[in-house]
Swiss-Prot record:
GO terms for biological process: glycogen biosynthetic process. CDD domains: ADP_Glucose_PP (cd02508), LbH_G1P_AT_C (cd04651). Homotetramer. It is an enzyme of class 2 (transferase). It comes from Streptomyces avermitilis (strain ATCC 31267 / DSM 46492 / JCM 5070 / NBRC 14893 / NCIMB 12804 / NRRL 8165 / MA-4680). The keyword Nucleus does not apply. The keyword Nucleotidyltransferase applies. It catalyses: alpha-D-glucose 1-phosphate + ATP + H(+) = ADP-alpha-D-glucose + diphosphate. One of its GO terms (molecular function) is ATP binding. Belongs to the bacterial/plant glucose-1-phosphate adenylyltransferase family. Keywords: ATP-binding, Carbohydrate metabolism, Glycogen biosynthesis, Glycogen metabolism, Nucleotide-binding, Nucleotidyltransferase, Transferase. The lineage of its organism: Bacteria, Bacillati, Actinomycetota, Actinomycetes, Kitasatosporales. This is Glucose-1-phosphate adenylyltransferase.
Length: 406
């Protein structure tokens, strides 16, 4: 941070494979997946850090990282005159000829970055969630408490706990009494037994505490070398962990509807549902907040165009789109073409998708460059769709990059 504040290094964990989000992650890392028409998932965490004046950030990458590396280097160019940077850091095998064994091992292998910067605190954040947050408020509570690590938590239904790391707070509601990685049946919260605190994957560490924890973990032959599965439980056992309640975080320009909004979009269903949150008249998450913007590279495209017969309602239509058919409750990325007589309903279309004359697309997520030929249908015949495409548990149809519809 600048302007006389504490020195903070941002580390963004962006090395996961994202298998649950197939087919969108077949050719790219999950943080590089398009979201909301023009953004990449990584843009949300980077925007939150930059808006909070955390301007020295390392993004640790590993699997299928070319698209992510290119996006970061071409979009997130900070002023080097002021010593600021956002840089992708691929696995460098500094500790031997091996890839990262887990998120904790990724940071361990990148400690040279910490030694170079010598920050007082380190903000370790995930790269693939949709939300707005002011990390300065979490940092302030961390410094005031004197804890070794502060973990951001959000209330979720207890029935969903198996998808998250779960934080069990102590009697004071602030110290962390237990940290459970994806438990099947954890106890509920006092006074709210049907909810638990899920870890958001965002942590603030006192630098010395993190380094020592990573070194101890590296010597543990039984460890999985993961932040949630290893480091957090170990620091909890040592009494050094504190909970930060995300509901207390406020950003400028937020509405009562999107305050506290956070989504893990790690599955096709969750990804689709988060897009549907964007398009209501009163959206659950409002992309149009100029007081706390989400930044990205907008490209050099002409404005969207609607020809005679082209209609769109309750939708996000990006630059470069040509709409000659009907689009409802959908999100279209740049360069999408919808031909006359075509119908797109409740769908997410990535860059340069072409929906041919008279075609129908319903309840689908189409990756970039997908071709839907004239008269073809997606989301009309469930049996046929299941034979040809990826279909999620919730019935969302997914087509991979460049796939042509039969």
């Amino acid at each position: 941070m600048r302007r006389g504040g504490p020195s903070v290094l941002g580390i963004v964990l962006a090395g996961g494979e994202g298998k649950r989000l197939m087919p969108l992650t077949a050719d790219r890392a999950k943080p590089a997946v398009t979201f909301g028409g023009t953004y990449r998932l990584v843009d949300f965490v980077l925007s939150n850090l930059v808006n909070a004046d955390i301007l020295r950030i390392c993004v640790l990458t590993q699997y299928k990282s070319h698209s992510l590396d290119r996006h970061i280097t071409t979009t997130w160019r900070m002023s080097s005159l002021l010593g600021n940077y956002i840089t992708p850091v691929p696995a460098q095998q500094r500790l031997g000829p091996r890839w990262y064994l887990g998120s904790a091992d990724a940071i361990l292998q990148s400690l040279n970055l910490v030694y170079d910067e010598r920050p007082e605190y380190i903000a370790v954040f995930g790269a693939d969630h949709v939300y707005r947050m002011d990390p300065r408020q979490m940092l302030g509570e961390h410094i005031e408490s004197g804890a070794g690590v502060t973990v951001a938590g959000i209330r979720v239904p207890r029935a969903e706990s198996s998808s998250f790391g779960v934080i069990a707070p102590g009697s004071d509601g602030q110290t962390v009494e237990n940290f459970l990685e994806k438990p099947a049946d954890p106890p509920g919260l006092p006074g709210d037994p049907e909810c638990v605190f899920a870890s958001m994957g965002n942590y603030v560490f006192t630098t010395k505490v993190l380094i020592e924890a990573l070194q101890r973990d590296a010597e543990d032959g039984d460890s999985v070398h993961d932040m949630g599965g290893s480091i957090l439980p170990a620091l909890t056992d040592r009494g050094e962990a504190r909970l930060y309640d995300f509901s207390a975080n406020h950003v400028p320009g937020e509405t009562t509807r999107d305050q506290g909004y956070w989504r893990d979009v790690g599955t096709l269903d969750a990804y689709y549902d988060a897009h549907m949150d964007l398009i209501a008249e009163r959206p659950a998450f409002n992309l149009f907040n100029r007081s706390w913007p989400i930044y990205t590279h907008s490209g050099q495209l002409s404005p969207a165009r609607f020809n005679a017969g082209g209609i769109a309602s309750e939708s996000i239509i990006s630059a470069g789109c040509l709409i000659r058919g009907q689009v409802t409750r959908s999100v279209l990325s740049p360069g999408v073409v919808v031909d006359p007589g075509a119908v797109v309903q409740g769908s997410v279309l990535h860059d340069n998708v072409h929906v041919g004359r008279g075609a129908v697309v319903r309840g689908a997520v189409l990756d970039k460059n997908v071709e839907v030929p004239p008269g073809a249908t997606i989301g009309v015949n469930p049996g046929r769709d299941a034979d040809l495409y990826t279909v999620s548990k919730g019935g969302v149809i997914g087509l991979g990059k460049g796939q042509r519809v039969s």
